[in-house]
Design a protein with these regions (language model features):
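Structural motif
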Residues: 53, 94-98, 139-141, 191-195, ...
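Residue-level detector of Asp-centered blade-edge/turn motifs that repeat once per structural unit
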Residues: 39-40, 80-81, 126-127, 177-178, ...
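Hydrophobic beta-strand positions that form the internal "hydrophobic ladder"
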Residues: 44, 85, 128-131, 179-182, ...
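Cleft-lining beta-strand/loop regions that shape enzyme active-site pockets
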Residues: 511-521, 535, 540-730, 769-773, ...
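Multi-bladed beta-propeller domains
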Residues: 2-30, 56-74, 89-90, 98-120, ...
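PDZ/PDZ-like domain segments forming the peptide/carboxylate-binding groove
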Residues: 484-544, 740-741
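Extended, small/polar residue-biased N-terminal targeting/export presequences
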Residues: 446-503, 570-596, 781-782, 786-807
Length: 808
């Protein structure tokens, strides 16, 4: 009040229908996150949008077993007798094991009561008395269903980075046919995966691999006489075309381990007079017998070619396995769920055949008769005897649930809070009272009217950790702006106000080393020159009355006719055809790199080379070789890590740059060569700035640690914690929980929230940059030129072939 000086709080209320918060019936067939199958293969289990459904092979209704929009129900597993379904649910506030009747008529029963933690991967024992599972502590357990007693089996002390949380150890376990043993793999102190067999009666686990290789995905044969497993022990090197280096792919084969010391081999010698081998593979209901002494020596290789095998399962006739025939399972390849092909190896014929292609996952029924598979957005069931099947997709048109958004938003918020609690690398959450933070931001949830509001609240919550790589995104967002593509010609323009016409001020070209990036106006025969006028697009006259880009709406990727002239009039103009880009980002990037390269080349009389790293993953892996090999004989190199978006460890690039000559070869008719052949004998500097982060932080750090030269620029972003994978939320959103952090060789925490401080600080002036001036690049050139003047790069040469005898 301007007269009294009093302040009064205004109560503002904006009426809204809150359409995103309304309960509604939705189909979730495009949100499937897990599958399973009934014991006789008549129905599939489908996990979608946090609900558990059973779907008939052909006839009958779809049952929604859980009907819990406010809970995330997951990892369903059908009991061997077909009467119950086990699954995990966070209905209580933590993920607990529940069981429910297979038609959902009765209320579910919660079997566990944990205080906290994330659990995954449920598997029933064949006799139906126990359920094995794994938690975030990398511990394998089994639950006695009757007594509800939980027994720990084993704990993994090591893990690989960058694997999904549901594939963290110990997840590849399998039961013996008599339910008395569990086989699984875990990483040992040797940093290789080994197979262990745990005896429930002895409460003891034994390493049965005792090998030097990666052994994993074990499965018992149905007669209980052998253990089949995958092992990465086939090393057929692929050599690089440019240098002496080896890469090993397709390293996996499948092996059998005979469990009894007097047992028959899995692949005995064939003899027409011998008993039909198939008779020896019938299911044996008696107890499995294992002679652990010498078991690691009773291993044989199955007659299959090396590949990328995973996820074994068996019935009486076949071994089933997935193989990723294109690409690989390399943990350094960030991809979505891979597409794999299902094969079967027949025990009798000792040959394999394809079953179905391009699936994400599969499961074999308890009786071995049927297979459920997940392929794209479809789920299907086919007989296990199928060969090269096109599949049998189930009818998911009625895979529907009652969605109550506000209840789901509460679940999403609570799960995001729990995931940080359970997977954040520092158990004390950097001193943040995490319970208090949950309560603080939960008060905002009732005010949320959209999924975007929920994302914002979670972002504020995880922001309290003051840690990089904490992201939340995606989800069931309804309000999405429609985008209209705008074609881009790869040029800068100016408006000739007098003529009211646009002219080309700068035309972006593609340098020889980047022909894979298209420059629309730089194709042979176009001959468009800077300063010429753009008069028409598809016969529509282009004038300054409209924004230039309005003429290119909807034309990205389309062939367009351009009328061009060196005068602002149609007389004498020529028509050319071009294909505009959707984005000029890549084209402008390579032009910036090429300008820098040429500038360094010109200012150093060709003695200094230039290499830019846009990231520490595929971008650099693609561009690095294009200008690395051609600059091997430079006397200086500028390693530009500015604006580096990160990815993985950049050492793969730096080790090449840091390879020095150890000796030399001389030849009669050509110049001498270095040993190794690909070496760098040059003075180097590394440029960096505040826009370089994650792997972009690591690049200047490792460059300096390796003693490769000084770092120039400004302090980096300071984000060097890691995330193994994005954590899925119930509605398709994603969350990250940083689960590892860097420290140096003295045990000091480094870089995170600090960045890498350069040896020589040089600010980047944006105005100068826009005018083509780059103080950091200039400083790098100056330093290397000065270094070359004081310490010239020389080749030693060799002594004469025949020494002068009088020289002594």
């Amino acid at each position: 009040d301007t007269r009294s000086g009093d302040n009064q709080k205004l109560n503002i209320h904006i009426g809204s229908d809150s359409p995103e918060a309304r309960p509604r019936l939705i189909n979730v067939k495009d949100q499937i996150t897990g599958i399973g199958i009934s014991p006789k293969g008549k129905r599939a289990l489908v996990e979608a949008r946090g609900e558990i459904f059973t779907v008939p092979y052909e006839h009958g209704p779809i049952y929604n077993l859980t009907k819990s929009s406010g809970a995330h129900d997951k990892d369903p597993a059908w009991s061997p007798n077909g009467k119950k379904v086990a699954y995990l649910s966070d209905e209580s506030g933590e993920y607990e094991i529940h069981i429910i009747d297979s038609k959902g008529k009765e209320k579910s029963v919660q079997l566990t009561d944990h205080e906290n933690g994330y659990r995954h991967t449920l598997r029933w024992s064949p006799d139906g008395s126990k359920i094995a599972f794994t938690d975030q502590n990398l511990t394998l357990y089994f639950l006695d269903v009757a007594s509800e007693k939980i027994t720990p089996v084993d704990k993994a002390e090591y893990e690989s980075v960058d694997v999904p949380i549901d594939e963290k150890p110990i997840y590849d376990f399998s039961w013996s046919p008599d339910s008395r043993y569990l086989a699984y793999s875990k990483m040992t102190e040797k940093q290789v995966f080994q197979i262990f067999i745990y005896s429930l009666e002895e409460d003891k686990a034994r390493n049965v691999s005792q090998s030097l290789f990666y052994d994993f995905h074990p499965v018992f044969t149905r007669d209980g006489r052998h253990l089949l497993f995958v092992s990465n022990r086939t090393f057929n090197p692929t050599f690089g075309d440019f240098e002496w280096e080896m890469v090993y792919k397709d390293v996996a084969k499948i092996y059998s381990m005979t469990l009894q010391k007097d047992g028959k081999p899995f692949m005995p010698f064939r003899n027409d007079e011998a008993t039909d081998n198939n008779e020896n593979r019938q299911t044996d209901e008696s107890q499995v017998k294992i002679d652990f002494e010498g078991i690691s020596g009773r291993v044989e290789e199955l007659p299959l070619p090396a590949g990328n095998y995973r996820y074994l399962s068996v019935n009486d006739q076949n071994l089933f396995y997935l193989n990723k025939e294109e690409g690989d399972f390399n943990r350094f390849e960030f991809r979505e769920v891979p597409s794999m092909n299902l094969h079967a190896f027949n025990f009798e014929s000792r040959s394999s055949h394809p079953v179905i292609s391009s699936i994400h996952e599969y499961e074999l029924s308890q009786d071995g008769s049927s297979i459920v598979y997940h392929q794209g957005e479809s789920v299907g069931i086919l007989p296990s005897s199928a060969r090269e099947s096109k599949g049998h997709s189930l009818d998911l048109s009625n895979l529907e649930m009652e969605l109550e958004p506000r209840k789901e938003w509460q679940q999403i918020y609570q799960e995001a809070w729990r995931m940080e609690r359970d997977y954040y690398y520092e158990p004390d959450m950097h001193g943040v009272d995490w319970d208090q933070m949950r309560e603080k931001y939960a008060k905002l949830l009732p005010k949320a009217t959209s999924r975007e509001d929920v994302r914002y609240i979670i972002g504020e919550l995880i922001g309290e950790l003051n840690t990089s790589h904490t992201y939340v995104f995606g989800g069931d967002r309804k309000r999405r702006a429609e985008s209209v593509n705008v074609g881009m010609l790869g040029a800068d323009y100016t408006l000739d106000e007098k003529a009211n016409r646009y002219r080309f001020e700068k035309i972006l070209r593609h340098p020889a080393w980047a022909r894979g990036v298209m420059a629309p106006l730089d194709r042979p025969g176009m001959n468009i020159r800077e300063g010429e006028y753009l008069l028409a697009v598809n016969d529509e006259s282009v004038t300054g009355e409209q924004n230039l880009y309005s003429y290119f709406q909807g034309l990205a990727g389309e062939q367009v006719r351009l009328l061009v002239n060196n005068e602002p009039t149609p007389e004498g103009a020529r028509e050319i055809t071009a294909e505009p880009l959707r984005s000029e980002r890549s084209l402008r990037y390579i032009n910036w790199v090429e300008r820098n390269r040429q500038k360094v080349e010109n200012l150093s009389d060709g003695k200094i080379g230039y290499i830019h790293f846009p990231d520490t993953y595929m971008g650099s892996a693609t561009f690095f070789p294009k200008y690395f090999y051609s600059q091997l004989r430079k006397e200086g190199l500028i390693i530009d890590g500015r604006f580096n978006g990160g990815g993985l460890d950049p050492y793969i690039f730096l080790q090449r740059l840091n390879t020095k000559p150890l000796a030399y070869w001389t030849r009669r008719y050509s110049h001498d060569q270095t040993i190794p052949s690909t070496t760098v004998n040059a003075h180097m500097v590394c440029l960096t700035n505040k826009y370089a982060g994650s792997g972009g932080d690591m690049l200047p750090f490792e460059f300096r640690e390796l003693g490769m030269g000084p770092v120039i620029g400004t302090r980096t972003w300071g984000g060097l914690v890691g995330v193994s994978q994005y954590i899925p939320l119930v509605d398709g959103g994603m969350l990250t929980a940083p689960d590892y952090r860097i420290y140096d060789q003295q045990g000091n925490w480094i870089i995170e929230n600090e960045g890498v401080t350069p040896d020589i600080r040089v600010e980047l002036n944006s105005l100068e940059m826009s005018n083509g001036k780059d103080a950091q690049l200039r400083k790098g050139i100056e330093m290397i030129r000065e270094k070359l003047q004081n310490e010239p790069i020389t080749w030693p040469g060799h002594k004469p072939f025949l020494e002068d005898p009088q020289a002594n």
